[in-house]
């Protein structure tokens, strides 16, 4: 009986693993499975009280239907239209400078360190997603 319980817990833990693909699908509705892509960086660190951050960078050529899904979630056309200091910070953390073709989403949290940011550069085919909650 104990073996079945432990096996069940193990299966549950494996099925709940957060992957870049699952995060993008759940948060943005974008499904990269079936597309050619490579995850160049992934960080997903959270503590028990809910504070933490997620950062995903991937090389992927999104079809127009996925770009339309991002727009339906509030993404705006590039270039980034934010105050200059915020724009420079977003370009620096994403590594995507002066992009003009693609979409981005930025939402400031309640605290200065909190934000939700996504950018997709259609020229370089780079998708970057960052979420920070403190």
Question: Each predicted region: which residue ranges?
Answer:
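Extracytoplasmic electrostatic interaction patches
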Residues: 77-134
